[in-house]
């Protein structure tokens, strides 16, 4: 990942870096890897995420049908 610094504006470069890392999911990944996750917990989390994605997709589809 690369961030250019213009006019010695380090604060802006740090903000850009944080935004890029957030967009890439780096913070979420670091938080996940901080502690070991048992395979059973990983399966449970993945299943919950899939359900969340499905519900979100269904909500968006129902809202698109209303408009």
Swiss-Prot record:
One of its GO terms (molecular function) is structural constituent of ribosome. Disulfide bonds: none annotated. InterPro entries: Ribosomal_bS21, Ribosomal_bS21_sf. Gene3D superfamilies: Ribosomal protein S8. One of its GO terms (cellular component) is ribosome. Pfam families: Ribosomal_S21. Keywords: Ribonucleoprotein, Ribosomal protein. It comes from the Bacteria. GO terms for biological process: translation. PANTHER family: MITOCHONDRIAL 28S RIBOSOMAL PROTEIN S21, SMALL RIBOSOMAL SUBUNIT PROTEIN BS21M. Belongs to the bacterial ribosomal protein bS21 family. This is Small ribosomal subunit protein bS21. It comes from Magnetococcus marinus (strain ATCC BAA-1437 / JCM 17883 / MC-1). The lineage of its organism: Bacteria, Pseudomonadati, Pseudomonadota, Alphaproteobacteria, Magnetococcales. The gene is rpsU.
């Amino acid at each position: 990942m690369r961030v250019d610094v213009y006019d010695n504006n380090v604060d802006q470069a740090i903000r850009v870096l944080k935004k890029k890392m957030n967009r890439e999911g780096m913070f979420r990944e670091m938080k996940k890897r901080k502690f070991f996750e048992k395979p059973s917990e990983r399966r449970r989390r993945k299943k919950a995420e899939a359900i969340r994605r499905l519900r979100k997709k269904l909500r968006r589809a129902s809202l698109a049908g209303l408009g």
